[in-house]
């Protein structure tokens, strides 16, 4: 069956439908990872977005459910050059096509993803419409496509109830803004007791749990939407509790301390982004998934200073807070998918809680 992707600039891509037979309007973004498509599909940070995989062959190692980064996939759609009909992997439990259909996710294959990615790079991230209905009239659906925006996705992806992951070491409260599983896994691996709480948990309730440290997780959407959450984070900043923040959490902490954020032209999504540690001069290859960044020109240097920078485009990738046990990074040290070069940051957080 034919499937179509119509972008808000009026361009149309034709391919084959290999997923669920439904329409979807979404923000179209691209990911440059060669592997890790299941982790991408189940990363809550992609809520409200359809993902173009730039690597030309997807699905060749199937689906292993243990690799999921959430209890369900969050993408609105998947766009690939070629979907493998054969999965060769001793861990394989399902085909990617079955996974997409079971989870009602549309997928287009057979389109020129190089051309599509080039268009998104040149013109910036765009909204798009995925459909199997060939009777569409571009002029009639453009307004609907342009009006779409990613809204209210943090509450949708966050846990609704607090829960505890046992450990005998330090107690860490993980505020779930759409947290990937591997964040908690990395903390448990280091012996921590992890208490995962909903995104809208009040600071006073978090303090009642007597945490040794607090983690602000990754998550989807525009950080500025989360006005009430930002107010609670400011209250946590005013304590002496060690705080480690990742991705959206990094942006929220920056906003809570008076800085600004802005939308990137086409974002950073993939497992091959170089970031430079400004203190040591060392460069790490990182896993990234964000469409917004902290504006360094708005930082109060009496509060925080840049700690990491993106080697490719010079955007901020981390902050160090003055006279506070707080550090934040824009990228994903927990990886999954991607390199584990920066997993040492979890060790740094543990040491910070012990000091």
Please place each PLM-identified region on the residue numbering.
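RNA-binding accessory domains that recognize and position tRNA/RNA substrates
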Residues: 1-204, 208-209, 223, 336, ...
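Short clusters of small/polar residues that mark proteolytic maturation junctions
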Residues: 17-18, 55, 288, 311, ...
């Amino acid at each position: 069956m034919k499937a179509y992707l119509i972008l808000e600039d009026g361009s149309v891509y034709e391919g084959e439908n290999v997923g669920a037979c439904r329409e979807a309007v979404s923000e179209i973004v691209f990911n440059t990872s060669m592997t890790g498509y299941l982790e991408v599909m189940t990363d809550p940070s992609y809520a409200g977005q359809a993902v173009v995989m730039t690597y030309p062959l997807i699905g060749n190692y199937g689906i292993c459910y243990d690799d999921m980064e959430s209890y369900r996939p969050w993408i609105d759609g998947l766009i690939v050059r070629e979907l493998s009909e054969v999965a060769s992997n001793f861990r394989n439990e399902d085909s990617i096509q079955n996974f997409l259909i079971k989870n009602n996710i549309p997928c287009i294959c057979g389109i020129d993803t190089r051309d599509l990615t080039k268009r998104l790079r040149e013109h910036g991230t765009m909204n798009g419409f995925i459909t199997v209905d060939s009777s569409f009239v571009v002029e009639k659906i453009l307004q609907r496509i342009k009006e779409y925006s990613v809204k209210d996705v943090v509450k949708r992806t966050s846990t609704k109830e607090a829960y505890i992951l046992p450990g005998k070491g330090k107690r860490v409260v993980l505020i779930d803004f759409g947290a990937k599983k591997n964040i908690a896994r990395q903390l448990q691996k280091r012996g921590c007791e992890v208490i995962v709480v909903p995104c809208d948990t009040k600071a006073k309730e978090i303090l009642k749990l007597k945490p040794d440290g607090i983690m602000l997780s990754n998550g989807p959407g525009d950080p500025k939407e989360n006005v009430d959450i930002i107010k609670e984070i400011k209250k946590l900043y005013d304590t002496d509790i060690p705080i480690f923040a990742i991705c959206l959490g990094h942006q929220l902490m920056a906003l809570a301390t008076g800085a600004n954020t802005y939308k990137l032209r086409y974002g950073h999504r993939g497992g091959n982004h170089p970031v430079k540690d400004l203190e040591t001069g060392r460069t790490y290859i990182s896993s990234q998934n964000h469409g917004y960044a902290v504006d360094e020109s708005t930082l109060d240097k009496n509060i925080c200073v840049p700690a990491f920078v993106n080697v490719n485009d010079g955007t901020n990738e981390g902050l160090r807070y003055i006279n506070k046990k707080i550090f934040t990074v824009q990228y994903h040290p927990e990886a999954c998918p991607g390199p584990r070069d920066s997993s040492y940051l979890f060790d740094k957080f543990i040491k910070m809680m012990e000091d």
